[in-house]
Design a protein with these regions (language model features):
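Soluble FAD-dependent oxygen oxidases
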Residues: 1-225
């Protein structure tokens, strides 16, 4: 995609903005263009948002770089903290997603926690590869906190919200999923069957541990028994 939009929910506003600790929604869109005119043309729909008059900050079609973008992510993902994540691929419309995601955006449990609603469209046939699960929209939430005494509450917050998304979810991206807490498909059925066949050939005794299992018992309902 030439234009990659992501709607971020966070309690860390852009520099210079005071939101009083409340969550803010950031429509952060990056793109790769040949010239400024092309950038303005392809990003023009974003400049017609009906909520622009309520924006705390507006930046449109300005140059950026990795050096500009990376510190933003560093601030949102501080070292030395505890993290829990969950995610969903979906083809659901914004009309269907908004009531569910709105609750996630409004109730972020810590200053550092955040949620992303990523425009992945359009999906396309994938080559012969392990990555085989995707949708036109990618949603992920990350709880970030300091103390182990809060582990259960932080993990339950993110898991419970993504259970609410299951009716419209196609599956999960493995890198942001914790299958020991919530079962989810992460490969296309044919690809997963092929994986199991390869394991039967090369690891028939299952010496390699399934990380999505608890104490030797399958925790992921999508794994064949």
């Amino acid at each position: 995609a030439r234009v990659e939009p992501v709607i971020v929910g966070t309690r860390i506003p852009p520099p210079g903005i005071d939101a009083g600790g409340d969550p803010v929604i950031i429509m952060h869109t990056t793109g790769m263009f040949d010239n400024p005119d092309e950038a303005r043309r392809l990003m023009a729909p974003l400049d017609t948002c009906p909520a622009l008059d309520r924006a705390l900050l507006r930046v449109f079609a300005e140059p950026t770089s990795f050096d500009d973008e990376n510190p933003i992510m560093d601030a949102q993902n501080p070292p030395g903290m505890r993290y829990s994540a969950d995610c969903a691929w979906t083809d659901a419309s914004a009309r269907d997603l908004t009531p569910i995601l709105g609750e996630i955006y409004r109730t972020l449990p810590t200053r550092e926690s955040f949620v992303i609603w990523y425009g992945w469209a359009p999906t396309r046939p994938l080559p012969d590869m392990a990555f085989s699960m995707e949708g036109n929209v990618y949603v992920a939430a990350y709880t970030i906190w300091e103390h182990d005494r809060d582990d259960a509450a932080m993990q339950n917050w993110v898991t419970s919200h993504f259970r609410n998304l299951e009716p419209v979810s196609k599956g999960s991206y493995l890198g942001d999923a914790d299958l020991t807490r919530r079962s989810s498909k992460f490969m296309a059925d044919d690809n997963f069957a092929r994986l199991q066949t390869l394991r039967d050939v090369h690891d028939p005794d299952r010496r390699f541990f399934d990380y999505y299992q608890r104490s030797g018992c399958a925790a992921n309902e999508f794994e064949p028994r």
